[in-house]
Curated annotation (Swiss-Prot):
Protein's recorded name: 3-methyl-2-oxobutanoate hydroxymethyltransferase
Species classification: Bacteria, Bacillati, Bacillota, Bacilli, Bacillales
Keywords: Cytoplasm, Magnesium, Metal-binding, Pantothenate biosynthesis, Transferase
Species assigned in the record: Staphylococcus aureus (strain Newman)
Annotated catalytic residues: 179
The enzyme's E.C. designation: 2.1.2.11
Any one annotated GO CC term: cytoplasm
């Protein structure tokens, strides 16, 4: 299992870090088998696997449930679990209680929290031994305000992002996710920080990349962002399901190959 120190060492050696967002036991098992460095259990699970209209409906209990499943599937991978909307920002005491519950009950390596405004939370969580990954740029929990659009696209916004990135590192963040920002800005931020910077829609100048399992494998998703590359096509599973339906209806399945050979009814009838 990678440690924070090893991830920082990868950055220093300019070895790119791979991260995949996964939500359950079988996907986590595949991600670990592939040798991916990190797994993010994102609150995007609300839409991707729970069918919610947005991440607003995702609860702390949801994140714990899925975080546990991912840890069971990937016991030797660095796992980061999202703090869902509403878990940070109520009061420092409640925020830390939520963070501790999530961290302890999922056995994650770190939790992730969004936004530049959570710097005090990062400081306090770090002080009590909870590693925090920060998330800047496009923060999904704020799309109701910001919308799904490129962030840091003006001089002022870019300068603010650079400042915010430095602040979350100074507060104690162990890594930073940058989403949907210009490539050159992401590269500049990565150069200025000592912690690993993982990009999603932020170009190749970051220390690593993260994509969602379902997006990159075309598994049950209808709309993919510009920055998503498809590496395999799991949608072919529909063809298998159609064939199954046809064979059940025609009687072709189950054939003798998939049937137990043991005969029992003669014995049953002989007892009558």
């Amino acid at each position: 299992m990678k440690t924070v120190s090893q991830l920082i060492d990868m950055k220093q050696k300019q070895t790119k870090i791979s991260m995949v967002t996964a939500y359950d036991f079988p996907s986590a098992k595949q991600v670990e088998a592939a040798g991916i460095d990190m797994i993010l259990v994102g609150d995007s699970l609300g839409m991707t696997v729970l069918g919610y209209e947005s991440i607003v409906q995702v609860t702390l209990a949801d994140m714990i449930h899925h975080g546990r499943a991912v840890r069971r599937g990937a016991p030797n991978t660095f796992v980061v679990v999202d703090m869902p909307i509403g878990a940070v920002g109520i009061s420092m005491t409640q925020d830390l209680n939520h963070a501790l519950k999530l961290y302890q009950e999922t056995n994650a390596n770190a939790i992730k929290a969004e936004g530049a405004h959570i710097t005090p939370f990062i400081e306090k969580a770090t002080a009590i031994g909870i590693p925090v990954v920060a998330h800047l740029g496009l923060t999904p929990q704020s799309v109701g305000v910001m919308g799904y659009k490129l962030q840091g696209a003006t001089k002022e916004a870019a300068e603010q992002l650079i400042l915010d990135a430095k602040n979350v590192e100074q507060a104690g963040a162990v890594a930073l996710v940058l989403e949907a920002i210009p490539n050159d800005l992401a590269e500049e931020i990565s150069k200025h920080l000592t912690i690993p910077v993982i990009g999603i829609g932020a170009g190749k100048g970051t220390d690593g990349q993260v994509l969602v399992y379902h997006d990159m494998l075309n598994y049950g998703v209808e709309h993919k962002a510009k920055f998503v590359k498809q590496f395999a096509d799991f949608s072919v599973g529909v063809d298998g399901l159609k064939q199954y339906d046809q064979e059940v209806k025609s009687g072709a399945f189950p054939s003798e190959e998939y049937t137990y050979k043991k005969k029992i009814m003669n014995e049953v009838n002989n007892n009558d």
